[in-house]
């Protein structure tokens, strides 16, 4: 499955439940931070699903951005970070995430999205 196909599937899941989904992909830390800030300031986003990749283990800046916007977020990892190298087992985000989906493959994105929708409806 390609990134575009994954995003299309997730957009359909959101639409079928009466929600909108905005997808971004970037390998640039500052662009991730800008998107997080924009989620609060410009886009009225109610939840964030994020796969921070290698920034999981390195980015205090992404942690600060997510903490600062006070939007519930769901951390997704395709592989199980706890079954990888020692340096990959630490996450700067997991302790402040609403929930972590790790090791469930691409299905983790769908699980996180559905959890975000469910929690948004329970507000």
For each predicted feature, which ranges?
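Short catalytic helix/loop segments, enriched in acidic residues and glycine
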Residues: 1-15
